[in-house]
Amino acid sequence: MIMDPYLAEFIGTTTLLLFGAGVVANVNLKNTIAEGQNPWVLITAAWGFAVFVSVFITSQSSGAHLNPAVTLGLAVAGKFSWSLVPGYFCAQLFGAMLGSWLAYITYIDHYRLTKDEEIIRGTFCTGPAVRNLKNNFFSEFIGTFMLVFGVLFLSLIHISEPTRPY
């Protein structure tokens, strides 16, 4: 189904954050079913599923940017119109806000039971274990660069019909 690209980015980013923040909340908050259950495997698998579903939903309509860094990287590389950037940024921002809010509302009773502020914060964002602004910035820069580089590389691949053996 093709939809408006801004709506697609909004829905895709909402889906991404709802699943992503939701699984982190489910693993880390008090009295949840998955509390303490091999968090790294569960969180990684669920975030991978969240990305897959979000890209699947939005790829035909908006290109599945789902992240302002991807939108900016594609615009800088000349693969995306600058006139669409502000709308994509807004759709992604509001989608992220709605997805996070929906995850919060889903687990609101568990948030109320959880007293550790770092665990609560960790359901919505990451933070450095060691605060060093230079190293923390460099780490985020490299991670974002690799994400955008991967998306740009994938955008160069032309998928053709499979070769038939006959």
What would you call each of these model-derived segments?
Residues 1-160, 164:
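Membrane-interface helix-loop junctions and terminal tails of multi-pass membrane proteins
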